[in-house]
């Protein structure tokens, strides 16, 4: 089974990858893949590490700025695309789980040919789109997260599950509020209708058609610190694999 973690910088993606892997290692054979050319340290031992071929730091010494170096690093990774793809496919055959950690600059993986082609060639990968509770301040934000998960699904051609990370930092009242907004579309739509702004109207219209365009997927509530939600993620990954990508 291949699980791909994507998320914005600071969402806790890499820490979650490592801790979920250690959780799985109690019962399964697990391999890790690091696709972040800019990361300094990892909380896991990768079987495949793109930094062995190229790093952002090395490219910046050539005169590139930080953003340009990230893009250039992925341009250079394309030279080794088939090699990395074949290595990952071998890992998938030799292990129960392959956990793929993507760049902290999420757009690098989503919009570069390397990420898209890789996902097109992997067998039934499950994408976990990780969000930080800090970005969820108003009803519009929940609408954004659900639709962005759909956009990732469309872009990568892989089932994408939205996940709220760092839930150990939330009170029970806050957790319940997040669940209400994520899981009760009627409630979210009603709240959005109260916002008279142009953004509120747009979010309301998008949310109103959510049941028509969004597949019925579950939202995960995770914590790398307490391992909350890990059993749910394990179950969902198993169901995804056994149904060949259909979680409906």
From Swiss-Prot:
Its EC number is 3.6.5.-. It is an enzyme of class 3 (hydrolase). Belongs to the GPN-loop GTPase family. One of its GO terms (molecular function) is GTPase activity. A motif (Gly-Pro-Asn (GPN)-loop) lies at residues 65-67. Homodimer. Interacts with DNA topoisomerase VI subunit B (top6B), DNA primase DnaG and RF-C. The keyword ATP-binding does not apply. Keywords: GTP-binding, Hydrolase, Nucleotide-binding. Small GTPase that may be involved in genome maintenance. Has weak intrinsic GTPase activity but displays no ATPase activity. This is GPN-loop GTPase PAB0955. It comes from the Archaea. The keyword Nucleotide-binding applies. Pfam families: ATP_bind_1. The record marks 67 as: Stabilizes the phosphate intermediate. It comes from Pyrococcus abyssi (strain GE5 / Orsay). GTP binds at residues 10-15, 165-168, 224. Disulfide bonds: none annotated.
